[in-house]
């Protein structure tokens, strides 16, 4: 059987992969087999961390809201605020509440005092 050298198609495929990993260090940007492995690994990490980012931001928002709310009343916490928001049928998500908590604390205090009543 004769040997097939794979020609320009394989070269184009490898060049495309090399462009993806061009910023990697050492053999990870030079050798075809390790390029393939590192590309797969990078894509897996990117996919995992996109989900992780959503969790991390939600935790950050909750921490910010809780820190500001505890400064207002003696025995008031994040969980009570969220419970009272749902009870009052106010639709404010955690991202918006965190932005209000950072930029305008008095506004958040007013919201929390109104829903307590």
Swiss-Prot record:
Major localization listed first in the record, in broad terms: plastid
Gene3D superfamilies documented for this protein: 6.10.160.10, Ribosomal protein L20 (1.10.1900.20)
Pfam families in the cross-refs: Ribosomal_L20
Record InterPro entries: Ribosomal_bL20 (IPR005813), RIBOSOMAL_L20_CS (IPR049946), Ribosomal_protein_bL20_C (IPR035566)
MF terms in GO: rRNA binding; structural constituent of ribosome
Record-level GO BP terms: ribosomal large subunit assembly; translation
GO cellular component terms attached to this protein's record: chloroplast; ribonucleoprotein complex; ribosome
Compartments reported by the entry: Plastid, Chloroplast
Alphabetical list of PANTHER family matching this protein: 39S RIBOSOMAL PROTEIN L20
HAMAP family the record matches: Ribosomal_bL20
Family: Belongs to the bacterial ribosomal protein bL20 family.
Known function: Binds directly to 23S ribosomal RNA and is necessary for the in vitro assembly process of the 50S ribosomal subunit. It is not involved in the protein synthesizing functions of that subunit.
Name the UniProt record assigns to this protein: Large ribosomal subunit protein bL20c
Lineage: Eukaryota, Viridiplantae, Streptophyta, Embryophyta, Tracheophyta
Gene name of this polypeptide: rpl20
């Amino acid at each position: 059987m004769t040997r097939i050298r794979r020609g320009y198609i394989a070269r184009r495929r490898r060049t495309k992969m090399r462009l993806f990993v061009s910023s990697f260090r050492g053999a990870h940007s030079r050798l075809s087999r390790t390029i393939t492995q590192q590309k797969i690994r990078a894509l897996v990490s990117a996919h995992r961390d996109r989900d992780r980012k959503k969790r991390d931001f939600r935790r950050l928002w909750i921490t910010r809201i809780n820190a500001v709310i505890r400064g207002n009343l003696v025995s008031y916490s994040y969980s009570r605020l969220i419970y009272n928001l749902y009870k009052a049928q106010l639709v404010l998500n955690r991202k918006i509440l965190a932005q209000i908590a950072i930029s305008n604390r008095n506004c958040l205090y007013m919201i929390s005092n109104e829903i307590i009543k």
